[in-house]
Amino acid sequence: MTKIRVWCFIFLGILSRLSGYAQPTGLVNYDYNYDDKIKTVILRPYGSTVGFPMTYLNSDRPLELIFDDLNGDFVYYKYRIVQCDANWNPSQLTELEYLQGFNDQEIREYAYSINTRVVYTTYNLVFPNDLLSVTKSGNYLIHVYRDDDNTPVLTRRFVVSEQLFGVSAALASSLEAGKMMEDQRIDLSLTTSQR
């Protein structure tokens, strides 16, 4: 009986080591740069100069991630999207439950610096995109890592929201001439989306 237990522990130990083999290790669940050569990290709504990194589910308004690599040479970077709970810890959902497409996609847009004292490469990613999109609202992390050795480069938080209802308001003045400036009415209208 003890031989079986020993073999079970050995098997479980090997299995636990292999299951995390392809994933970047040492990741944190907050905005963080793992590499000192990564600078000017911006995550914002696409087309905006500033803004909270939030998009709507099934929206045509994606997010844009931009960062500079001061190493100067081109590096193959990949990204991974992870859904989180309210405390920004990874959720228990599988990727099939919150993603459409495959995780671990390459960042394909980049540009070299021109006429600068410091040589750097700017990487640009617009997501959700045709290769990977989110199917559930919630808190998310995007992890960027080097393709060759899975070394983490940066982590950023973003939110995917879902418009389940809308509120509109209209002001109406009193019809009596003497009370026009004193009595007003606010008409609120709530609309819900069909699910």
Give the positions of each predicted feature:
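Short acidic/polar inter-strand loop motif in beta-rich domains
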Residues: 86-88, 132, 146-153
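Low-complexity, Pro/Ser/Thr- and charge-rich linker/hinge segments at domain boundaries
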Residues: 25-31, 160-183
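Contiguous beta-strand segments within globular domains
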Residues: 33-83, 178-194
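Bacterial Sec-dependent N-terminal signal peptides
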Residues: 1-26
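Local beta-strand/beta-hairpin segments that build beta-sheet-rich folds
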Residues: 93-96, 151-155
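Extended, solvent-exposed segments with strong compositional bias
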Residues: 99-120
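Ligand-binding face of N-terminal immunoglobulin V-set domains in extracellular IgSF glycoproteins
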Residues: 119-147
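Short aromatic-acidic-glycine turn motif
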Residues: 86-94, 166
